[in-house]
Amino acid sequence: MFSKKKYVQTINAKGIFNNTYETKIPQTIISSVILKHFEKSTKKPKCIFIGWDGSRCDSMKYLIKSDNEKVSGVNDTAVFSAISEVKNSGGLYISYVGGEENSPQETSTAQGWASALCGKWMKSPWKNGIDWSLDDDYPTVLKILSEQGYKTSFSAIWPIHFENTYKNEIDFAERNKLNQFFYKLETDLELYDNLVERIQGDEDFIFGIFENPDMNGHALGFGDGNYRYVSGVCNLDKLSYQLLTKIKERSTFEDEDWLVVIGSDHGGHSTRHGTQNIQDRTTFLALSKPVEDLME
């Protein structure tokens, strides 16, 4: 039987996160962190935001060793690991989705990524379901940066991103000839190849959403009980590490200031999500710079 107390003890295990469940941060901070990076950088600012759809907060124990063998086993921290590398240079934080307690929203994909990209929780008509599209009051960080002259890109697999959630913003970018581009892919490997192209190109802000943890969770279960879910998270960590390697291979890398963001839109329990329980609400956020420095 699931125990909330045990779940909190797991994610609070010393060594995994830089904060605790009691000091968790809202996913809405992501937009502010990215914009602050572009404002404050003394070199040419760049940012990649790698989304791991459906990756639970406690999945970080598969990648980062804790001081408690009952939590992370006797495994060492993954070597060729994006999460480990980003944590070492910045931090790995417990975060939460699904709105505040007095104004909850669905812990699902549309609400999750939109809240992260817009920097605020969804308005009442958008708190549930998918039949809505962001309006002028909810510009994403991509739109804000492209209007400032930066080139931005959004790469994803789920059709609803393009048909509903970001449709208004896609139309706005096309009408106003903004350097804001959207790419619809079919698989995680296609998405990886697309992100490599973006990294090797001239984009300033790159956002992409991998789907495997969420798909495995819906098919056979979120969490430790489904080895396919575990392997989905671990495989994404390796793919993300390869993306970081591609960034360092850029001929202009030394003249650039890259912020790496890795995060999730929601967790999951059984074969679903969307509720306000801790497994659905609690997520992770990895930043290549300490959050305190970014928010000064």
PLM regions with names:
Residues 2-296:
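Feature captures the catalytic ectodomains and active-site-proximal regions of enzymes
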